[in-house]
Regions:
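P-loop (Walker A) phosphate-binding loop of NTP-binding proteins
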Residues: 205
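Small-molecule kinase domains that catalyze NTP-dependent phosphoryl transfer to phosphate-bearing small molecules
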Residues: 311-359, 363-369
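Conserved substrate/cofactor phosphate-moiety recognition/catalytic segment
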Residues: 208, 215-264, 268
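Hydrophobic anchor at the beta1->P-loop junction of P-loop NTPases
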Residues: 202
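Nucleotidyltransferase catalytic core that binds NTPs
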Residues: 1-197
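Short glycine-/polar-rich loops that comprise or flank the Walker A/P-loop
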Residues: 94, 160-161, 293-298, 340-343
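ATP-dependent NMP and nucleoside kinases share a basic, alpha-helical "lid"
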Residues: 240-247, 263-321, 328
Length: 369
């Protein structure tokens, strides 16, 4: 990592440099002296983003006494917890850090997902408190380290004086030998109730929240053991299977048709395909539905009002559209045809992304569960 001033010098002599993500969404303005966020940074949905668990190292007060950290790749076993108790008593530890390593990518099918791992270590913390009443037990969501940093380095940054690395693979007899909370998460991940393939097509204005809800739905489904969950983001798919298409009516319909066809193939292979394009025209949405004939298919309209979408606009697209510098922009210079055949309508300005995702999941369970 380099200081912002060094990065600024490397990039050039401009007074301000705009930092964008991989989708070209502006994140921050960088000068030689400061970094200014363009808009409040978006966060994910789920326990991995809980402020109580995802804490900065500066928020964990160091104690002037031995501190043990457990690096948890998987839900902790009874043997691991007993070892922590024994070692804490041996060295008179005053704090135990339960560090759940959280990756940006989902765990493989059949394995405990980030939310499940965090539920397991939170429950383990309560169990340890009963055995070590004078020891402070702190569960943490620790992002997987980048570069040369190791998980042990991160644990020591949180104040650990001794680091224990948990198992990276389950024993053959799992979940035998695990506490109830860990057993529940292992069995949840191995659940095969979601046996059918399905397609969920979100539609809505830019900035309506459909991509955030789609991502939350994918996380919820994986957390319940669903196999082959695939999130097909509208912007990302436009850069791949729809590269070269414009934004006129015919091109937009072709884009949605291709997206629907790709989603249907994934569903026929047993996966749950979640797509989140704008899909402004009834014709394009009908083509996507037609591609999924014979499959469970949900059309979810995210009906967030236009004025709210404009307020949320991180890319500044609505401003450019109203200024006339972007043509054929849905909601401004190109129409959005409100679907009359949506299976579910959600105003994302009235509910949280998590609540919206739960609503979609419950309907999908009735349709394809």
């Amino acid at each position: 990592a380099q200081p912002s001033s060094a990065l600024h010098r490397y990039l050039g002599n401009e007074t301000t440099v705009l930092l964008c993500d991989e989708e070209n969404t502006p994140l921050s303005e960088l000068s030689a002296s400061e970094v200014t966020h363009v808009r409040p940074l978006a966060t994910g949905v789920g326990l991995a983003w809980s402020q109580e668990l995802r804490r900065h190292v500066s928020s964990v007060t160091e104690v002037d006494a031995p501190t043990i950290a457990l690096i948890a790749y998987l839900p902790p076993s009874i043997a691991e917890l007993n070892s922590l108790i024994t070692r804490a008593n041996e060295i008179d530890a005053k704090r135990i850090l339960l560090c759940a390593l959280i990756s940006r990518t989902p765990a493989p099918d059949g394995e405990v997902q980030p939310s499940g791992l965090l539920r397991a270590i939170t429950s383990a913390a309560k169990e340890l408190e009963g055995s070590l009443p004078t020891c402070q037990i702190t569960p943490l969501a620790v992002p997987w380290p980048k570069g040369d940093l190791s998980p042990e380095d991160l644990a020591r940054a949180y104040g650990a004086t001794e680091v224990v690395t948990g198992a990276e693979r389950y024993p053959a007899n799992a979940p035998t030998g695990y506490p109830v909370s860990s057993t529940e998460e292992i069995e949840r991940a191995r659940n095969t109730a979601w046996g059918k393939g399905a397609v969920v097509l979100f539609t809505g204005l830019s900035g309506s929240g459909k991509s955030t809800i789609a991502a939350a739905l994918a996380e919820l489904l994986r957390d319940e053991g669903a196999r082959g969950v695939a999130l097909l983001d509208g912007d990302a798919m436009r850069r791949s299977i729809s590269a070269g298409l414009g934004f006129d009516r015919a091109s937009r319909n072709t884009n949605v048709q291709r997206l629907g066809a790709a989603a249907a193939e994934l569903a026929r292979a047993g996966g749950i395909a979640i797509a989140a394009p704008i899909a402004p025209f009834a014709e394009g949405r009908a083509l996507a539905r037609k591609a999924s004939v014979g499959l469970p298919f949900l059309l979810v309209h995210i009906s967030t009002p236009l004025e709210v979408c404009e307020q949320r606009d991180r890319k500044g697209l609505y401003v450019k559209a109203r200024a006339g510098t972007i043509s054929d922009f849905t909601g401004i210079s190109s129409p959005y045809e409100v679907p009359d055949d949506a299976d579910l309508v959600i105003d994302a300005s009235a509910v949280s992304a998590y609540e919206a995702a739960v609503s979609v999941k419950e309907l999908l369970k009735k349709t394809a569960g």
